[in-house]
Structures are given as structure tokens and as C-alpha cells.
């Protein structure tokens, strides 16, 4: 048999004619991804602090949240938020449901990333800060969270890129 050469020509006219839809999609990606990243990161950091708590019930509650959300697909979470809130009688716009789904998802992943960063801080540094008279809040901010954020920056950046890509799941 003879090989037949393939000649493909991409028609950019169809892309250019759909340019407004591409721009609208890019804008919606930004509108969903940026707030979900910020709110999810703050929530994940609070969850990570909760997972390191002395209170057993708080550790278990935060751990259960993280494990459930990390072990269910994002699409299932989106369906649960959209249809679950509606079945409870709460009227939520599609945008709000999508944003809430992304926030609760990225918070669970950010929690584990931040917890790993916090656990990497040597206990001696925390004890030294306490001996210097820093309050618990000051110790967490200056000695634990800020250095942990520097250590986990690459992992957090990757997670936020994945969030931006996953925002396409929420399209209508």
C-alpha cells in the first residue's frame, strides 16, 4: 500500500470569528480563579492551623474535611453544591455555586500544602520565639506561617494553576 500524504490546513477564520467567546471565557476564568485562590488559600491556612491544634475534635474535624474533599472529584463537589443547596431551598446563582465549589476544593488542597510547610519548621524555632515572649499569634505569623509560605510557594503555585485549569469544569 502507498502512503498518502496528509495535508491539513488550520482555518483561523473560525477562531477569529469566535474571538468574543474566547475573551468572555478567559474573563470568566479570571473571575472564578482569582477569588477562589485567595479565599481558598486563607481557608486552607486556617484549616492547617486547625489540624495542628491541641484540641482533638478540631484536628479530627479539619482532617475529615480535607480527606473527604481531596478524595472526591471536583465535578461531584460542583454537583453537590449546585443541587444540594437548591434542595435545601437556597437560591444560589451558577457563578456563586461554581465559586463556592472551587473555594472548598482549593481550601482542602491548600490545607495539606500549608500543613506540610508548617510541619517543616523546626520545633526549636517555635520554642525560641516563645522564650522571647512572643504571643501565640506572633509565633504563628512570624515564625511558622511566613517561613512555611516561602517553603511551599512552588507547590501552592502549582495548585493555583490547577485550580485555574479546573475552573473549566464549572462551565455551563
How would you label these PLM feature ranges?
Residues 3-172:
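Transmembrane alpha-helices and adjacent helix-loop boundaries
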Amino acid at each position: 500500500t502507498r502512503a498518502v500524504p496528509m495535508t491539513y490546513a488550520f482555518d483561523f477564520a473560525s477562531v477569529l470569528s469566535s474571538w468574543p467567546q474566547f475573551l468572555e471565557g478567559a474573563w470568566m476564568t479570571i473571575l472564578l480563579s482569582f477569588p477562589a485562590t485567595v479565599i481558598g488559600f486563607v481557608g486552607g491556612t486556617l484549616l492547617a492551623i486547625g489540624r495542628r491544634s491541641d484540641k482533638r475534635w478540631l484536628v479530627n474535624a479539619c482532617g475529615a474535611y480535607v480527606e473527604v474533599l481531596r478524595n472526591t472529584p471536583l465535578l461531584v463537589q460542583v454537583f453537590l453544591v449546585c443541587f444540594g443547596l437548591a434542595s435545601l431551598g437556597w437560591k444560589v446563582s451558577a457563578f456563586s455555586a461554581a465559586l463556592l465549589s472551587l473555594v472548598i476544593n482549593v481550601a482542602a488542597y491548600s490545607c495539606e500544602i500549608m500543613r506540610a510547610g508548617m510541619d517543616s519548621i523546626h520545633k526549636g524555632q517555635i520554642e525560641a520565639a516563645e522564650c522571647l515572649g512572643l504571643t501565640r499569634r506572633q509565633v504563628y505569623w512570624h515564625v511558622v506561617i511566613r517561613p512555611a509560605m516561602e517553603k511551599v510557594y512552588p507547590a501552592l503555585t502549582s495548585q493555583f494553576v490547577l485550580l485555574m485549569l479546573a475552573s473549566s469544569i464549572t462551565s455551563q
